[in-house]
């Protein structure tokens, strides 16, 4: 990405869009999301990816002190439901919600359902 600049970033974004947004997301929505992601500064995106590659938050999960809602999809390309559940169970006061689909950006692809689940979760704690 660094050597190719913005055109390489846009090509990478488009090539990886299916896993990010899943197979059911509308083409025009995916095109907009690709444009939006590709408008990020290349050095910002590269720095973000480098930070993710070396990140291991596993040891910190038990230190999360607030109620936590974890949302994933059945076919997320990032981790299986079982792997996500194993992480979620290490977070005190947490709950896992699994949505149908195969995206790993559920907040984008299933925004209305994520909002509904989040509001219900927040109201449970009040």
Show the residue positions of the predicted features:
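Conserved alpha/beta-hydrolase catalytic His-Asp/Glu region
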Residues: 5-63
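Hydrophobic "lid"/C-terminal helical patch
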Residues: 16, 49-52, 87, 114, ...
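Residue-level signal for the nucleotide or nucleotide-sugar donor/cofactor binding architecture
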Residues: 40, 79-82, 109
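Short alpha-helix in the alpha/beta-hydrolase fold that links the catalytic acid
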Residues: 57, 66, 80-89
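Short beta-strand/loop motif that positions the catalytic acidic residue
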Residues: 64, 70-72
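Residue-level preference for short coil/turn positions at secondary-structure junctions
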Residues: 64-65, 126
